């Protein structure tokens, strides 16, 4: 699977699992994405896909590296569809 395709799938999953934040942007907690069965089956490397999406300014989140458990409450915010 290529990176562009995985980033597009990530955007779809944020739409499915996310909700509007105070700024009116779609967001989802990292833990929700990481623990979702469909996401687990779609993404071989969720953190890598998130990093690629962040580099492309499609999503934003605090920090550079997200770890399961430690960063479950970090918001992944969708910047563009």
Curated annotation (Swiss-Prot):
Pfam families: Costars
Highest taxon in the source lineage: Eukaryota
PTM sites of type N-acetylmethionine: 1
InterPro entries recorded: Costars (IPR044302), Costars_dom (IPR027817), Costars_sf (IPR038095)
Keywords: Acetylation
Family indicated by similarity: Belongs to the costars family.
Protein name: Costars family protein ABRACL
Organism of origin: Mus musculus
